[in-house]
């Protein structure tokens, strides 16, 4: 007799859920809200004048447990300056086939060059398109920014950049 009651209880659960309103998410048309601190796609940030924050130190690659990041640093020159320090990340790649979204690379970055956005739509049917280079990772240029390579802001030092004392400047004066 107890087995019969178990079956009746199961039918009761099914019968009770038949009259509930269905929950349907219309995902592609209306994406749902994302948490504020969601770990989505990575982004390489820039200083307000457009120089890259990445100094090519490779700490993010060392911190990555999935070995998904490849960084090749190079030296800045006065004629070609991409970041305010001595070095910059000449090659920067993140393999999203390997990335586990843990955020350890973000914590390891000494200049806060690498952050994670709320973008989570990265699906693709081609595996090679999921290896993002600097062209896909760099933050877009905002008004007042100049695309590198260019010189540092006038009368500024590396420390001014690291302390956040650089403002977007009109480059017309040069």
UniProtKB/Swiss-Prot annotation:
InterPro entries: 4Fe4S_Fe-S-bd, 4Fe4S_Fe_S_CS, NADH_quinone_OxRdtase_chainI
GO cellular component, one term: plasma membrane
Co-factor: note: Binds 2 [4Fe-4S] clusters per subunit.
Chain positions covered by the region annotation Disordered: 143-174
Subcellular localization(s) per the UniProt record: Cell membrane
Reactions the enzyme catalyzes: a quinone + NADH + 5 H(+)(in) = a quinol + NAD(+) + 4 H(+)(out)
Every 4Fe-4S ferredoxin-type domain range: 44-74, 90-119
One of the Pfam families matching this protein, by short name: Fer4_7
A biological process term (GO) from this entry: aerobic respiration
Keywords: 4Fe-4S, Cell membrane, Iron, Iron-sulfur, Membrane, Metal-binding, NAD, Quinone, Repeat, Translocase
Annotated positions binding [4Fe-4S] cluster 1: 54, 57, 60, 109
Required co-factors: [4Fe-4S] cluster
Described purpose of this protein according to its UniProt entry: NDH-1 shuttles electrons from NADH, via FMN and iron-sulfur (Fe-S) centers, to quinones in the respiratory chain. The immediate electron acceptor for the enzyme in this species is believed to be menaquinone. Couples the redox reaction to proton translocation (for every two electrons transferred, four hydrogen ions are translocated across the cytoplasmic membrane), and thus conserves the redox energy in a proton gradient.
Protein family (similarity comment): Belongs to the complex I 23 kDa subunit family.
The protein, known as: NADH-quinone oxidoreductase subunit I
Source organism of the structure: Mycolicibacterium vanbaalenii (strain DSM 7251 / JCM 13017 / BCRC 16820 / KCTC 9966 / NRRL B-24157 / PYR-1)
Phylogenetic placement of the source organism: Bacteria, Bacillati, Actinomycetota, Actinomycetes, Mycobacteriales
Gene that this polypeptide is encoded by: nuoI
């Amino acid at each position: 007799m107890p087995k019969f009651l178990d079956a009746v209880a199961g039918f009761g659960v099914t019968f009770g859920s038949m009259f509930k309103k269905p929950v349907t998410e219309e995902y592609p048309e209306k994406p749902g809200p994302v948490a504020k601190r969601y770990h989505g796609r990575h982004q390489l940030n820039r200083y307000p004048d457009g120089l890259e924050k990445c100094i090519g130190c490779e700490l993010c690659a060392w911190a990555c447990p999935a070995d998904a990041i490849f960084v090749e640093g190079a030296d800045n020159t006065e004629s070609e300056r991409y970041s305010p320090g001595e070095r910059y990340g000449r090659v920067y790649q993140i393999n999203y086939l390997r990335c586990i979204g843990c955020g350890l690379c973000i914590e390891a970055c000494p200049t806060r060059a690498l952050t994670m956005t709320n973008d989570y739509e990265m699906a693709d049917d081609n595996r090679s398109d999921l290896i993002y280079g600097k062209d896909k990772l760099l933050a877009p240029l905002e008004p007042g920014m100049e695309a590198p390579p260019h010189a540092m802001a006038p009368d500024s030092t590396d420390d001014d950049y690291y302390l956040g004392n650089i403002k977007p400047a009109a480059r017309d004066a040069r």
